[in-house]
Amino acid sequence: VFVPGDTVTLGWEQFAVGLNQESREELEYLFREWEMERDPEEMIRESMAPVRQAAIGPMLVGRELEEINWEPVKMDDPRLTAHPDWLKEFRDFAWSDSSSLTLHQSARIERTEDGFQTWIYNRTDYDELLTGLEKQGLSLPTADEWAYLCGGGCQTLFPWGDGLDYSMRLRWFEDMDEDENRSYDMEEPNFFGLSIAYDPYMREVVQA
């Protein structure tokens, strides 16, 4: 998608509006449970990038997450069948109730509507990634560009405000939604049309 450029304020140092009551009560409860005598705003500030001005140029940006290292393959791919231990793990998975299985830096399998999808892990380093992108005429966003793509320069903790929206369906949170087919809200396209920064367990790579 085309993302227009702008001169924006990035980073975070204080609440623009303030936590809503539900979010503050939950944080205070967690602090009591962990026996932490700290101000929630101070703790959040320590995890944030400093406030700064940035001039962001216009750019064309991929709309969806593309995982590096993981290559989709068919189940009969020789690189899979050469590892009987992986195939045994896959067979055990097929008889389980799990939705996916990842063998660390080796292989992965997930259930789909049509059966199963498998991947193999191809090790690469940062320089190889940059070189491969350059050959395709592509590049990674800088840290400032990435922050702009996520938040558009908003000064609240989240794009929609300072507090959590408890009506949203989010990955890795207790799922209270009875409709399992409902999409995860943070994976929906944002104001730029991008699906970005929606999974804390998926690190997104930037140009550094």
Language-model features: where?
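Extended beta-strand/loop cores of jelly-roll/beta-sandwich
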Residues: 1-139, 144
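Functional-site microenvironments in short loops/helix caps that host divalent-cation chemistry
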Residues: 108, 112-208
